[in-house]
Amino acid sequence: MEVRKINTHNREKKLDDIVYDDFISTLRQIKEGNHQLREEFISEYKPFILKVTSNATGKYIDTRNSDEFSIALSAFNEAIDKFDIEKGYNFFLFSEQVIRRRLIDYSRSNKDDKEYPFSFFDDEYFYNNEKLLSKSYIGFEDIEAREDIEELKKKLQEFGITFLDLVLNVPKHRDSRQLCIRLAKMLAEDEQMYNALMKNKNIPRNELKKKAKVHGRTIGNNRKYIIALCLIFRSNLNLSKRYLEYYTMDGESDLI
């Protein structure tokens, strides 16, 4: 039993390394001039940018009409360019610093009409090299409250799903991801189907297939991803839910 535990731990660690390597590979391609990948990367991490902006300014951010959010987006883009992959720093902690510094620059040039909490200028948010080497580099921990993440983690475990499974089972094509999000939302909003999911620990495939008018194989092939997204829709992970709502649009609208 102990050997099996160690093997499982090693496997998860190895998969973590694979995910991290993929993340770094994406950053390298962006820094080498892949503009489409850069746009997709920034779009994917808008919830993180929104969270940093909201925390920094101490207020709700309307992404459709916010100078601060526009500045934060620009700062995140700047962080991509300035990030030194070879130093092994945590990209998200690094980009958070860049965003906060640009927001501070903006606030100082607009003192007359902007008010920010004192914590906005605290040094505790500017990390030393040791903290920047942290490997909490990717996933929900970057955008949501830890207790809500732990609650989701427990529910996923009931289905034999980990956060790593979620990362590894993301459909490659945007239209496939959008379809899975719609299926997950449909499953989450239908009490009868959701109760069946929680009771049987499996998607009520026939009911969902009939309601969504999709092939059963589509549901089966994306089972883990759909279940995870459904649980997110039923959770307190509000930023993640808003992002999923945004992702089902045409990609031209902003977060709502």
Curated annotation (Swiss-Prot):
Q: How is its activity regulated?
A: Negatively regulated by the anti-sigma-I factor RsgI1. Binding of the polysaccharide substrate to RsgI1 may lead to the release and activation of SigI1.
Q: What is its main location?
A: cytoplasm
Inducing stimuli: Up-regulated in the presence of cellulose.
Gene Ontology terms, MF aspect: DNA binding; sigma factor activity
The UniProt entry's GO CC annotations, sorted and at most eight, read: cytoplasm
Per its UniProt record, what InterPro entries does this chain match?
Answer: RNA_pol_sigma-I, RNA_pol_sigma_r2
Locations listed in the record: Cytoplasm
Entry's Gene Ontology BP terms: DNA-templated transcription initiation
Q: Please give the Gene3D superfamilies that the UniProt record associates with this protein.
A: 1.10.1740.10
Query: DNA-binding residues per UniProt?
Result: 205-224
Q: Where is this motif: Polymerase core binding?
A: 67-80
Supply the alphabetized keyword list.
Cytoplasm, DNA-binding, Sigma factor, Transcription, Transcription regulation
Free-text function comment from the UniProt entry = Sigma factors are initiation factors that promote the attachment of RNA polymerase to specific initiation sites and are then released. This sigma factor is involved in regulation of cellulosomal genes via an external polysaccharide-sensing mechanism. SigI1 promotes transcription from sigI1 and celS promoters.
Subunit details: Interacts with RsgI1.
**UniProt family annotation:** Belongs to the sigma-70 factor family. SigI subfamily.
What is the recorded name of this protein?
RNA polymerase sigma factor SigI1
- What organism, scientifically named, is this protein from? Acetivibrio thermocellus (strain ATCC 27405 / DSM 1237 / JCM 9322 / NBRC 103400 / NCIMB 10682 / NRRL B-4536 / VPI 7372) (Clostridium thermocellum)
Gene of origin?
A: sigI1
